[in-house]
Amino acid sequence: MLQRTPLFPLYAEYGAKTIDFGGWELPVQFSSIKEEHEAVRTRAGLFDVSHMGEFEVKGKDSVAFLQKMMTNDVAKLTDGRAQYTLMCYEDGGTVDDLLVYKKADDHYLLVVNAANIEKDFAWLSEHVVGDVELVNISNDIAQLALQGPLAEKVLQQLTTVDLSTMKFFAFADHVDVAGVQTLVSRTGYTGEDGFELYCRAEDAPTLWRAILEAGKEEGVLPCGLGARDTLRFEACLPLYGQELAKDITPIEAGLGFAVKTNKDVDFFGKEILKKQKEEGAPRRLVGIEMIDKGIARHGYAVYVNNEQIGFVTTGTQSPTLKKNIGLALISTAFSSLDTEVEVDVRGKRLKARVVATPFYKRTK
């Protein structure tokens, strides 16, 4: 039986086409991936991301615990701020990438990928020491993401809290949004400005309807996983299971900014990640653009002179750039810009070249 989010009963009303996404029945699209993608890039779109996992960490030893488990420096967080971070195994491979929200000195919220909820909770539980209470609240919490240049304008209609003062990666808890108690976070997974909204599961339908109603005149669309993927891909934001995995380190994936090997705490993977940061990793995630006609898909092999040098992690035709592009994890020796490589597309070797990333960056 597939799991469903609290918004599942509303999907049909909005024309959703659902798919099995890691054991969840979720909308791949409502109108079309291209229309939804364009709405987020030019106006705003609303996503149901209630399948994501939420853990609460409480207790006076919370910081020490999180510092041991996370690659980023959790001690630098102040109340009302969020941080992107990763959890690694001792060999540097990635357990998951996640967000850490600091509510108070002894109270944190972790937001993890849906497919990794059980694995992450087990990994964290195994290493709890001291006064730390770890609770999986995933089933109690719904998450909506309103993303795009008009996100603030639309959301502001529904709350008295001044959203214009909220910086990127800041959040406010207990905010009244359309009569619903909400944690409002200026974060996202699209490369655009936007907000991620956390509320009680039973309140999600009210919040969903209110946001779409408030955004009607601005052309805000409900959006599915298809557009979420093309948007995050253009912005070069990693997807666990593709750009990150148990055998891919954050350094290889180009996420060194979230790995603080200089923090005075030993965390899982620190030794190897420090070495890779200082000496370079054997593989590197790069952007590629197809020269020959064809689309590079996840898992396709990448070659130079008949030698396999890596594989494609994500690839598609970019709706914004109208180009066939991809992300590939390849041997660092071949990662310089403009290096010509070949991608095995269904048995044919097609030419591509290494290009700069991100493919898309919003203009302020």
Curated annotation (Swiss-Prot):
Q: What does the entry give for GO biological process?
A: glycine decarboxylation via glycine cleavage system
Please describe the quaternary structure of this protein.
The glycine cleavage system is composed of four proteins: P, T, L and H.
Q: Matching PANTHER family, A to Z?
A: AMINOMETHYLTRANSFERASE, AMINOMETHYLTRANSFERASE, MITOCHONDRIAL
Q: What's its catalytic activity?
A: N(6)-[(R)-S(8)-aminomethyldihydrolipoyl]-L-lysyl-[protein] + (6S)-5,6,7,8-tetrahydrofolate = N(6)-[(R)-dihydrolipoyl]-L-lysyl-[protein] + (6R)-5,10-methylene-5,6,7,8-tetrahydrofolate + NH4(+)
What keywords appear on the UniProt entry?
Answer: Aminotransferase, Transferase
Cite the source lineage: Bacteria, Bacillati, Bacillota, Bacilli, Bacillales
What EC designation does it have?
A: 2.1.2.10
Task: Name the Gene3D superfamilies on file.
Answer: Aminomethyltransferase beta-barrel domains, Aminomethyltransferase fragment, Probable tRNA modification gtpase trme, domain 1
Q: Name one Pfam family in it.
A: GCV_T
> What's the family?
Belongs to the GcvT family.
Which InterPro entries does the record associate with it?
GCS_T, GCS_T_bac, GCST_C, GCV_T_N, GcvT/YgfZ/DmdA, GcvT/YgfZ_C, TrmE/GcvT_dom1
* Full protein name: Aminomethyltransferase
A molecular function (GO) term: transaminase activity
Which source organism does the UniProt entry give?
Answer: Anoxybacillus flavithermus (strain DSM 21510 / WK1)
For this UniProt entry, what's an example GO CC term? cytosol
Source domain of life: Bacteria
Record's function text: The glycine cleavage system catalyzes the degradation of glycine.
